[in-house]
């Protein structure tokens, strides 16, 4: 343990990650700043992950049934003794200085409670072009957000124990978007940071169908969560207008204008492409929206070309178009479903002033 830093407990939730679990744990023990404990929480794996963890120098917690990553993280946090909790997914191998760099950020920024890492540009195991695409995009997306952030992601993240306890842990009803939802309950006094110095190599999804299924599922969850965040923000405004004490949770995070623009361009391209069957010259409409899409994400595409060349860039652009299209579809479905649920649950707002005693 490096002197002057708080104690760290590493929490590794795992479910059917026999392929990468050992690499994940060994990477933790190669850290220049050693944690006081490493806790692996097995979420009722069926592929031998539990047996692998039992043979590693870590504390193993076994959940009796599969309960999701939220429950696994909460179980690990409940057993941890460190002043800082470092959550790392079991398909990530941390760089040797990852924990030390996260602690340095916490020390340099006393108001910061959450330090989120980024993915390395190279995957932990390159199993095909789908994985290379996703890894490159995730690396670029996170690296561009180095500094103060407004949302929480917990694939490789350090958080002060006090802040975690103030939030009350992860919502165990959620199996997707649980980390984003966690951040909506984080008191506004706590700063969130993304650090490009906290790096891990990620073994991501490597087949097209699972990639699309995962992306749609998460997009639906994000869309539904967005409704809840907007409703909560509206209630805070009502409280302030009524003279009530405002809630301490942070307000709704800012909109990623670039991502929204890219999604809309992709949707417009897909929806207007059939116009070419009416008249050939109408192909200019989807061509224009597709060109706009490439301009919106131009910096990303130039980054990919520098690393992988023009041939892979063509594949990357096609995958990115598909990703944005499915993401918008999923978020639309999730938002609509969340809006319906919110409308059903929301009580009618009284227009009559409450009586007051004399």
Task: For each feature predicted by the language model, list its residue ranges.
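Short, flexible, basic/aromatic active-site loop/helix in glycosyltransferases
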Residues: 116-119, 131-150
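Catalytic donor/gating beta->alpha subdomain of glycosyltransferases that bind UDP-sugars
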Residues: 173, 180-247
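Glycine-rich, basic loop-to-helix element that forms the pyrophosphate-binding segment
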Residues: 63-80, 101, 154
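Short, well-formed alpha-helical segments that are part of the catalytic scaffolds
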Residues: 17-30
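Conserved donor NDP-sugar-binding/catalytic core segment of glycosyltransferases
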Residues: 97-129, 203
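Short aromatic/hydrophobic "clamp" motif used to bind/position activated sugar donors
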Residues: 85
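A conserved acidic beta->alpha catalytic loop
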Residues: 27, 34, 42-50, 65, ...
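Acidic donor-binding/catalytic loop of UDP-sugar-dependent glycosyltransferases
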Residues: 48, 92-105, 184
